[in-house]
Amino acid sequence: MGLSPHLAVTLFCFLICTGNGIHGCNDSPLREIINTLNQVTEKGTPCTEMFVPDVLTATRNTTENELICRASRVLRKFYFPRDVPPCLKNKSGVLGELRKLCRGVSGLNSLRSCTVNESTLTTLKDFLESLKSILRGKYLQSCTSMS
């Protein structure tokens, strides 16, 4: 006793219709990180003019995973209480969002370690905008590869 052709086609259609290609892009972690970045950059975050390592400038041999690893290393500066800059000490809401961002970006990272060159610096504002741009590109790429 096998499947009738009609039943096999119906089951196949159900299988296809539940895929992401039909329902649109659903990369929750990336979408949540981008939303958090939007909130942090829209709020007029304190310390936006402070300097952080410019780790998001890709060289020819830099992979996307390496950029994300470096970004997570920079964001760790806001995670541990001993490293928090004075301008964020009393801004628990913004600090919470930056910590959430650190956890999210670290979760995207598949590399165990990466080097951060601290010889070139950028403002926190420019760093967050660059990170947002990279992650939006990654999000769009993940959406188009599903369809």
From Swiss-Prot:
Matches recorded under SUPFAM superfamilies: 4-helical cytokines
Identify the gene encoding this protein: Il4
Single GO molecular function: growth factor activity
Protein name according to UniProt: Interleukin-4
Keyword terms, alphabetized: B-cell activation, Cytokine, Disulfide bond, Glycoprotein, Growth factor, Secreted, Signal
Give the domain of life. Eukaryota
Q: What is its main location?
A: secreted
List the cysteine pairs that form cystine.
47-87
Q: Does the keyword Coiled coil apply?
A: no
> InterPro entries annotated for this entry?
4_helix_cytokine-like_core, IL-4, IL-4/IL-13, IL-4/IL-13_CS
Q: Which residues are glycosylated?
A: 61, 90, 117
Swiss-Prot/TrEMBL GO biological process terms: activated T cell proliferation; B cell activation; B cell costimulation; B cell proliferation; cell surface receptor signaling pathway via JAK-STAT; cellular response to mercury ion; cholesterol metabolic process; defense response to protozoan
Q: What is the lineage of its organism?
A: Eukaryota, Metazoa, Chordata, Craniata, Vertebrata
Q: Which PANTHER family match?
A: INTERLEUKIN-4
Q: Please verify whether the record's keywords include Secreted.
A: yes
Q: Can you quote a single GO CC term?
A: external side of plasma membrane
Q: What Gene3D superfamilies does this protein map onto?
A: 1.20.1250.10
Q: Which Pfam families has this protein been placed in?
A: IL4 (PF00727)
Q: What does this protein do?
A: Participates in at least several B-cell activation processes as well as of other cell types. It is a costimulator of DNA-synthesis. It induces the expression of class II MHC molecules on resting B-cells. It enhances both secretion and cell surface expression of IgE and IgG1. It also regulates the expression of the low affinity Fc receptor for IgE (CD23) on both lymphocytes and monocytes. Positively regulates IL31RA expression in macrophages. Stimulates autophagy in dendritic cells by interfering with mTORC1 signaling and through the induction of RUFY4.
Species of the source: Rattus norvegicus
The leader peptide range reads 1-24
Q: What family classification does the UniProt entry report for this protein? A: Belongs to the IL-4/IL-13 family.
Its localization reads: Secreted
